[in-house]
A protein has these predicted regions:
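Rossmann-like NAD(P) dinucleotide-binding subdomain of oxidoreductase/dehydrogenase enzymes
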Residues: 1-71
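Catalytic core of tubulin tyrosine ligase-like
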Residues: 160-161
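ALDH superfamily catalytic-core signature
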Residues: 44-150
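Alpha-helix termination/capping residues and helix-transition junctions
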Residues: 30, 92, 170-173
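Conserved glycine-rich beta-strand-loop-beta hairpin in the small C-terminal domain of fold type I
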Residues: 145-152, 171-175
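Residue-level detector of conserved catalytic or cofactor/ligand-binding positions
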Residues: 175-181
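Residue-level signal for inorganic ion chemistry
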Residues: 36, 101, 164
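Mature, solvent-exposed C-terminal subdomains and processed small-chain segments of exported/organellar
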Residues: 167-169, 182
Length: 182
C-alpha cells in the first residue's frame, strides 16, 4: 500500500520485541517520531503519556457502544453483541455498553441474556431494560462511562436514535493531546 501511494516503505515500522525497556526507549526517540497514538487500556496509555518525550494523542480508554435500532434483525444483533462483548474482553474495542430502542427491548433483551449466559456476562441496565429482562441488574451512574475489560455489559433503553446518540456522546471516551513536559 505504501509503494502504491509512493510513500517510503520504511515509513511504517514494526517493533517485534515488546520488552518495556525497549518500548520506553522508543518513546523518547524525537529523531524518529513526531507523535504517538497509543491504543489500549488505561495502563498502556498512562505509560506512554508518562514516558514519552514526543507529543501523544491520547485516545482515552475504550467505552465502545452498540446501538440496536427498532428496525434491526434481532438474531443478527444478538450475534454481533455476543461477539463484540465476549470474543476478547480485555481489548479497548470490546463492546462495553449497549443502547437499545425501546420498541424492541422486550424481544431483544431476554434473547440476548440467554446468549450472554454462555459466557456468564453480567448485564447492568436502566429501569426500562430491567423491566424487559429479569436477568438485568441495576446500573450505577458510573456504569455508563466504564471500560470494564470484563464480562459486564451496561444497557440503556432509548426512545429514538437522537437519544441514543446523545447518550453515546455523553459517555464515550474523551480524546486529547498531551505535550511532553520533559
Amino acid at each position: 500500500a505504501l509503494r502504491a501511494c509512493k510513500v517510503d516503505e520504511d515509513a511504517i515500522q514494526l517493533i517485534e520485541d515488546t520488552d518495556r525497556a525497549i518500548t520506553t526507549a522508543f518513546m523518547k526517540r524525537k529523531d524518529f517520531l513526531d507523535v504517538l497514538i497509543p491504543r489500549g487500556g488505561a495502563g498502556l496509555i498512562r505509560a506512554v503519556v508518562e514516558n514519552s518525550t514526543v507529543p501523544v494523542i491520547e485516545t482515552g480508554t475504550g467505552n465502545c457502544h452498540i446501538y440496536v435500532d427498532e428496525s434491526a434483525d434481532l438474531d443478527m444483533a444478538v450475534n454481533i453483541i455476543f461477539n463484540a462483548k465476549t470474543q476478547r474482553i480485555g481489548v479497548c474495542n470490546a463492546c462495553e455498553s449497549l443502547v437499545v430502542h425501546e420498541n424492541i427491548k422486550d424481544a431483544l433483551l431476554p434473547k440476548l441474556a440467554e446468549r450472554l449466559k454462555e459466557k456468564n456476562v453480567e448485564m447492568r441496565g436502566d429501569k426500562a431494560s430491567q423491566d424487559a429482562c429479569s436477568d438485568i441488574i441495576p446500573a450505577s451512574d458510573e456504569d455508563w462511562g466504564k471500560e470494564y475489560l470484563d464480562y459486564i455489559l451496561s444497557i440503556k433503553v432509548v426512545s429514538s436514535v437522537e437519544e441514543a446518540i446523545a447518550h453515546i456522546n455523553k459517555y464515550l471516551s474523551l480524546i486529547h493531546i498531551s505535550e511532553p513536559t520533559r
